[in-house]
Structure formats: structure tokens, C-alpha cells
């Protein structure tokens, strides 16, 4: 049983299938647009940073800088409190 099988648990290597696709570079939208402060009244912008289930999408996924991510969280929470946005997708 000699060979380069890799041992008992060595299985077939699976192809990830990402060869043809390229990863789009994340960038901070607020920095690009030179926004000074994220406004809670701008609901259309805030909705882009909320998942379908109503959760705030983390900065590691959206590419938002930490400074603006904190402002974004506060703005979304304010908009929810003032009933400009729903807390969940069920409302």
C-alpha cells in the first residue's frame, strides 16, 4: 500500500470553482463620496447596508471603514426607533 495517497482520510480534492470569477475590491462608499456624517433620514442609503432579515451587514462584507460603520449603526438604530425603517423583515 505504498504511494502518495495521503493517508487514511485523504479524499479527492474538490475544485472551488472560483477560477473564472474575480473578487471585486471592497471600498468605502462614504469615503468615495466624501460624506461627513451618515444621516438617519436618508433611508435609501441605509437600506443598502441591511440584510433581508433586517440585520446590519458587517463592515468586513461591505468594505465600509470603521468610522462610518459606527455612524451607520447609530443612524440605522435611530431610523428604526423613529419608525422610518423596520426592525425585522416581518414588519
Swiss-Prot record:
Keyword hit for Transmembrane helix: no
Any one of the GO CC terms: cytosolic small ribosomal subunit
Top-level taxonomic group: Bacteria
SUPFAM superfamilies in the record: Ribosomal protein S18 (SSF46911)
Alphabetized UniProt keyword annotations: Ribonucleoprotein, Ribosomal protein, RNA-binding, rRNA-binding
Listed Pfam families: Ribosomal_S18 (PF01084)
MF GO annotations: small ribosomal subunit rRNA binding; structural constituent of ribosome
Listed GO biological process terms: translation
Keyword check for rRNA-binding: yes
Similarity section: Belongs to the bacterial ribosomal protein bS18 family.
Subunit composition and interactions: Part of the 30S ribosomal subunit. Forms a tight heterodimer with protein bS6.
Functional description taken from the UniProt entry: Binds as a heterodimer with protein bS6 to the central domain of the 16S rRNA, where it helps stabilize the platform of the 30S subunit.
HAMAP family in alphabetical order: Ribosomal_bS18 (MF_00270)
Protein name: Small ribosomal subunit protein bS18
Originating gene: rpsR
Amino acid at each position: 500500500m505504498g504511494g502518495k495517497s495521503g493517508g487514511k482520510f485523504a479524499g479527492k480534492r474538490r475544485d472551488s470553482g472560483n477560477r473564472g470569477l474575480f473578487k471585486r475590491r471592497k471600498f468605502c462608499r462614504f469615503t468615495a463620496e466624501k460624506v461627513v456624517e451618515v444621516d438617519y433620514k436618508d433611508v435609501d442609503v441605509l437600506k443598502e447596508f441591511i440584510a433581508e432579515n433586517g440585520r446590519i451587514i458587517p463592515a468586513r462584507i461591505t468594505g465600509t471603514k470603521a468610522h462610518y460603520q459606527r455612524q451607520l449603526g447609530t443612524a440605522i438604530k435611530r431610523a428604526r426607533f423613529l419608525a422610518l425603517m423596520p426592525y425585522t423583515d416581518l414588519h
